[in-house]
A protein has these predicted regions:
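Short beta->alpha connector loops
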Residues: 67-69
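Short, surface-exposed polybasic-aromatic patches that bind anionic ligands, especially phosphate groups
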Residues: 63
Length: 105
């Protein structure tokens, strides 16, 4: 999908690089980038701030993996984008597809 504002492709920011879940369907929403990898982080909030500084309005956050890391990412995006919509991708286990969910803070 193209970002309506600047024609750059959207990015799907995958919270946790887990091998147990598939993200193949999420790629239809944009280019895949990982916020956290298998490395342990002393300060996950600082790491998420650094990685998500490039999050644009047309991007998505794919909340997969550790719920604490998902909460960190949503908190960082809410702080960095006050009043703007945050697009999340949620997995539907019946259809094996992701669908968008929209949040406004």
């Amino acid at each position: 999908m193209q970002d309506e504002l600047n024609l750059e492709p959207a990015v799907v920011w995958v919270v946790d690089n887990t091998q147990r879940k598939t993200i193949k369907d999420a790629a239809r929403f944009g280019e895949i980038e990982h916020v956290f990898t298998d490395v342990q982080y002393d300060d996950p909030v600082a790491h998420a701030r650094e990685v998500l500084k490039d999050f644009r309005e047309g991007d998505y956050l794919c909340m997969i993996g550790d719920p604490k890391l998902s909460a960190v990412c949503v908190g960082v995006l809410a702080q960095n984008n006050p009043g703007n919509e945050i697009k999340l991708l949620q997995f539907d286990s019946r259809t094996f597809q992701y669908f968008p969910v929209y949040l406004n803070f």
